[in-house]
């Protein structure tokens, strides 16, 4: 459900081949003689949940309120129908257009836009939106093992954050956008000098 709510289409990649609602997990477990006793929400990959289960006959108390709450949320979203997925597809197409229009407009205006963070999910976004070295000449990264490499499919050079900032980009397109708060906290100097960050999801935001 969280992936649909946050428009996190960048989560869909070779590392994440299947996506389950709690109702589907519940049915799978019950088919194997298990039952859900708890479910915990987390922010992993834009929003996930962790399920605790036990054998049906075990005397573990179930966290019924939270389990029923999430099941009702899924029911209200219509996850057992095609509608929310069609709406997700439409929002994804619109987001692609809006983001590509924004980046191309900034570049046409003479602004320098770099990528920030050579993440797996970022590659999904770069490829889907069709960005290349023409729009985004470099990706800034902290992992030294990635320096000198290129983003797959889009062929954008990956360099250190230090090297990227020395070129004084006007904007960074943040690819690991779900780390928004920590990125803003650690980049106060860049922002105080006039630099801006573009967070692409869940909605396009410039800070």
Task: Give the residues covered by each predicted segment.
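Short internal beta-strands
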Residues: 137-142, 198-199
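A short, well-structured juxtamembrane/interface segment
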Residues: 91-109
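Glycine-rich adenosine-cofactor-binding loop
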Residues: 106-127
């Amino acid at each position: 459900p969280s992936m649909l709510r946050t428009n996190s289409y960048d989560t869909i990649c070779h590392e994440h081949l299947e996506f389950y609602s709690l109702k589907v997990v519940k049915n799978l477990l019950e088919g194997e003689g298990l039952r859900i006793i708890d479910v915990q929400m987390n922010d992993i990959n834009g929003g996930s949940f962790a399920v605790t289960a036990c054998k049906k006959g075990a005397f573990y108390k179930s966290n019924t309120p939270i389990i029923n709450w999430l099941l009702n949320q899924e029911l209200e979203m219509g996850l057992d129908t095609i509608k929310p997925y069609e709406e997700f597809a439409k929002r994804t197409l619109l987001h692609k257009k809006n983001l590509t229009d924004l980046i191309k407009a900034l570049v046409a205006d003479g602004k320098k836009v770099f990528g920030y963070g050579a993440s797996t999910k970022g590659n999904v976004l770069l490829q889907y939106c069709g960005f290349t070295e023409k729009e985004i000449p470099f990706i800034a990264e902290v992992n030294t093992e990635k320096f000198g490499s290129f983003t797959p499919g889009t062929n954008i050079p990956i360099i250190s954050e230090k090297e990227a900032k020395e070129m004084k980009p006007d904007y960074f397109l943040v690819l690991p956008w779900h780390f928004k708060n920590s990125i803003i906290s650690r980049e106060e100097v860049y922002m105080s000098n006039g630099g801006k960050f573009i967070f692409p999801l869940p909605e396009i935001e410039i800070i």
